[in-house]
Amino acid sequence: MCMSFSGRCILSDYMVGRDANRGDCAQPCRWKYHLMEETRPGQYFPINQEENGTYIFNSKDLCMIEHIPELVAAGVDSFKIEGRAKSAYYTAVVTHAYRQAMDAYFAHPSPDFRVPDWVLAEMEKMSHRVYTTGFNFGPLQNGQELNTGGYVRNWDVCALYRDQQGNRLIVDQRNRFFEGDVLEVLEPGQKPYTLTVRDLVREADGTRTEAANKATEVYSFAVDRPVSPDAILRRKRDED
């Protein structure tokens, strides 16, 4: 096993007793480290980028969605999406994006195939690290993220579909959203679309509200179209 790359980490079992091979990796590759050579106690290897240490064990995330033709030409006929310790939202977004990319390729197979822009955009809408193609095209170039151990998180899941009654969409809140917010709706097999939050109501007491800011409470708002029972509603984070 690799000593310290995400999802395959023997350090997890050794350090905290959580076995990566059993889907329980603690992801020590994402922790902050200082290195010290054993014959020089107290003398740290001079590679710290910041006060918290360095991230030399920190791999970027593998992403091959733009290379479907090459994978098919290589004989790949089944794709496994890494999903251990990932959220249901992450799994939904990534599998949906790859499914759409593969369907688009097989509808018009060509070495010059390009993934639709909206599908590529999906890969930026869940928590991830900077992407790399790994070792698929030769020796790894710039495959580690040396400057930070953090994730790219530009979108929040705001709500999950609960019910629809006429023109009222009823949702289970997951992160706060507000009257007037533009939410993007992710449905299975469909290109995402947007809804504007109008006439927001807290279902517990039927009162109008400007903010859905009570965790896991049920809210409703007006919509002008049917929404899939499997829909996930998300909102782009405000830029600082």
Model-derived features with residue positions:
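Active-site pocket-lining/capping segments in soluble small-molecule metabolic enzymes
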Residues: 1-78, 85-159, 166-240
